[in-house]
Amino acid sequence: MKIVISPAKSLNFEKELPTSQYTEPSFLKEARVVHKVVKTKKPSELSELMSISDKLADLNWKRNQDWKTPFTPENARPAVYTFDGDVYTGLDAYSIPLEKLDALQDKLRILSGLYGLLKPLDLMQAYRLEMGTKMPVGESKNLHEFWKPTVTKALNKELKKDELFVNLASNEYFSAVDVKALKVPVITPDFKDYKDGKLKMISFFAKKARGMMVRYIIDTNAETIDDLKGFNYEGYKFDANLSKGNHLVFTR
């Protein structure tokens, strides 16, 4: 099984790491090409490009100036312990037993506007560059177009013929994958909550549930679509009436 998730805007470079293990990102050459473009942007340009405050623009301008390769444990940090948003709250990577790290490293991939595709233990330096940023890179008119061939080829290389491919990323990030070119079907779980008698997709809960689904897969060694349907963390359960084919809906 392979799983893709989105990165997070929030980063944590302070928390003590539970392991000294790390790996090198696969696409640093391509990341340097993207970085070369973003490094030239002034804070005012970053603010407009990313629709962020002046304070955040200044912070990310500094990050862009400081970013450099090669990555080492002294100047970079494993991705799964660095991203700090709702998905990662649900995943709670810090509490994953170390004997399960190999499974996490094998199954999980993180889509990224700067790094393309990261394994959990891949080193990364601080950045902010969402996949939907309308920034031309070379002959590509945006980051989706730049990353799509590389990311899709990498996923196809890793996916075995009958392996499950689970999309737990946002639409913004998953659009960097050429679904038609994938050699396996895509399974897409959705998570909805009943509120005021109505079933809704509530962003915070849905993001957290995506992380919890990754954790469930690792905790239970899930391999089949029926295994996925057994997801029951924090009150969610599979809804057969709302689900169709490879679109799995979980409600609570």
UniProtKB/Swiss-Prot annotation:
State the similarity comment: Belongs to the UPF0246 family.
List the PANTHER family hit by this protein, alphabetically. PEROXIDE STRESS RESISTANCE PROTEIN YAAA, PEROXIDE STRESS RESPONSE PROTEIN YAAA
Report the InterPro entries cross-referenced here. Answer: YaaA
A Gene Ontology biological process in which this protein takes part is: response to hydroperoxide
Q: What is this protein called?
A: UPF0246 protein Fjoh_4905
Q: Which organism is it from?
A: Flavobacterium johnsoniae (strain ATCC 17061 / DSM 2064 / JCM 8514 / BCRC 14874 / CCUG 350202 / NBRC 14942 / NCIMB 11054 / UW101) (Cytophaga johnsonae)
Q: Which GO terms describe its cellular component?
A: cytosol
Sorted alphabetically, which Pfam families does this protein's record hold?
A: H2O2_YaaD
